[in-house]
Amino acid sequence: MQGIITKGIGGFYYIKTEDGLYECKARGKFRLDELTPMVGDKVEIEIDNNSKGTIEKIFERKNKLIRPAVSNISQAIIVFAFKNPNINLDLLNKFLLQCEYNEINAVVAFNKVDLVENPEKEEVVDIIKSAGYEVIYLNAKEGMGIEKIREKLKGNLNVLCGPSGAGKSTIINKLVGKDVMETGQISEKLKRGKHTTRHSELIEVEDGFLVDTPGFSSLSIEDIEKEEIQFLFPEFIKYINGCKFTGCLHYKEPSCVVKNALEQGKIHKKRYEFYIQIIEEKLRGKNNKW
């Protein structure tokens, strides 16, 4: 029987199958192979007479996140508030970079639309849309935009990510219709949210699954080669092969088609500046965790 791990606590794993939910333990062979079952894993299980099960096989993972420890994510809803806390554009770009690297479809949800006059005219919206990403506007407290999020979840294994205080837990509670996740208050001193989510669990919503991100995701460029970075910017792709020099990093090289596109306004200046920031970090040998 096949299913998906929705929760793991103290060596027990809860597997959602077509026949229902089963509590399972993992075979010892996984320990020998240094393979630990993760939430999101697609697995094969055997059920005993007491309706308990054993995980016999873990299928190959499409991707794997460390924080939260979740595998096979197909879509990320990146939640940022327009204000309280204010948007950190570098951080938003870093989330997008990680999504591209892990082959995760990214949708950007801007929450707290009531705090700005005209959400669609905010510069950050223009920057994100120019890169080809879908944008959803939310007032999660009032329930505005929640149905659009619900629609996006269908058929996907989804993760909500973004900075603390942006409204991730509020969104989950609205989607599920009950307080599954504790919501944190914004600290007046820091204007940042006190992070409150403490565990990873898949919640079934519509025809998909949703996991909230416990803690801040670990964002690192350590595993990304400098030559790979250009491919993580969707707006660069159609220009990359037109450059005069093979291996062009679109940095200081002449006859660069990406830089020409930038000059013509086809690539947003702030996205290109972020790209150069990452390239320079790699050239200096820095692999900072952000």
UniProtKB/Swiss-Prot annotation:
Query: Where found in the cell?
Result: Cytoplasm
According to its UniProt record, the EC number is: 3.6.1.-
What is a GO molecular function of this protein?
Answer: metal ion binding
Tell me its cofactors.
Zn(2+)
Q: Which GO terms describe its biological process?
A: ribosomal small subunit biogenesis
The source's superkingdom equals Bacteria
Q: What class of enzyme is it?
A: hydrolase
UniProt binding sites for Zn(2+)? 243, 248, 250, 256
NCBIfam families on file: ribosome small subunit-dependent GTPase A
Query: Which protein family is it in?
Result: Belongs to the TRAFAC class YlqF/YawG GTPase family. RsgA subfamily.
Function (record text): One of several proteins that assist in the late maturation steps of the functional core of the 30S ribosomal subunit. Helps release RbfA from mature subunits. May play a role in the assembly of ribosomal proteins into the subunit. Circularly permuted GTPase that catalyzes slow GTP hydrolysis, GTPase activity is stimulated by the 30S ribosomal subunit.
Q: State the protein's name.
A: Small ribosomal subunit biogenesis GTPase RsgA
Native organism is Clostridium tetani (strain Massachusetts / E88)
